[in-house]
């Protein structure tokens, strides 16, 4: 029997990248999946799951508004009658350059999507989850170390890390676990411009060279960690952040820029 047979999962940000990889793998492991994204390509994710023999539905919604989140949780309950797994993955990169040029509106929007969105998902899902439920949020190595992302993005992902730790404590005694995965550099739609820029300059070989594995990650590798946390194999893992980053977070690989350079 598949590890997630009989379970129901919601995956946000499922139109592509890590979210799509997570939705596909959870379905492959036996879960019924509600794929959610504000991009219309989320329908393709559900169709791909169905074509592979899985059970899935798709909802196009803003994953960081109370109305949108309440609606897709209700949709999962209507479609499948239960809720066991939530992967709160939807996010944006915001301004990548670590500078003060990003305005307050853009900063707030990054926090809204990357931090308030997961909080809303947790709050809406918990009343429908029972003992053995698993919530996984997508954080980032940028939330663990400085220098791996822009100011707003890094702050939002640091917030996600504390969010899962605090919610794990808040849900003490319920049997619901809350954890996070912290990806390193992974080629997705969100990071595509970084990869394209490196390739256009003939520096493709430099991508991912700051971690000990000397390569970037694949969305499927992050999905494997999500599937583990969603399963009963992780039944004693709670309030934790699993870095899936090739070892980037084990050191400080960014050389400081000399003053005046």
Q: At which residue positions do the language-model features occur?
A:
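Short C-terminal tail/terminal secondary-structure segment
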Residues: 96, 238-261
């Amino acid at each position: 029997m598949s590890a997630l047979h009989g379970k129901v999962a919601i995956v946000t940000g499922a139109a592509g990248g890590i979210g799509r990889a997570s939705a596909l793998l959870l379905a492959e492991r036996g879960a019924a999946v509600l794929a959610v994204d504000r991009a219309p390509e989320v329908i393709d994710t559900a169709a791909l799951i169905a074509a592979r023999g899985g059970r899935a539905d798709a909802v196009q919604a803003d994953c960081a508004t109370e109305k949108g989140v309440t609606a897709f949780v209700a949709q999962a309950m209507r479609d499948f009658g239960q809720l066991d797994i939530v992967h709160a993955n939807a996010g944006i990169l915001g301004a990548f350059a670590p500078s003060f040029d990003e305005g307050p509106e853009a900063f707030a929007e990054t926090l809204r999507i990357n931090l308030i969105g997961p909080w809303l998902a947790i709050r809406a899902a918990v009343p429908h989850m029972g003992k053995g439920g698993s919530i996984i949020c997508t954080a980032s190595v940028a939330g663990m170390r400085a220098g791996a992302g822009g100011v707003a993005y890094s702050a939002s992902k640091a917030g996600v890390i504390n969010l899962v730790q605090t919610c794990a404590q808040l849900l003490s005694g319920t049997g619901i676990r809350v954890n996070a995965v912290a990806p390193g550099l992974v080629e997705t739609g969100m990071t595509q411009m970084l990869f394209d820029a490196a390739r256009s300059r003939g520096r493709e070989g430099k991508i991912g060279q700051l971690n000990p594995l000397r390569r970037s990650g694949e969305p499927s590798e992050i999905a494997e960690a999500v599937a583990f946390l969603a399963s009963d194999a992780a039944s004693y893992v709670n309030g934790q952040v699993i870095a899936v980053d090739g070892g980037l977070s084990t050191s400080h690989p960014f050389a400081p820029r000399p003053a005046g350079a």
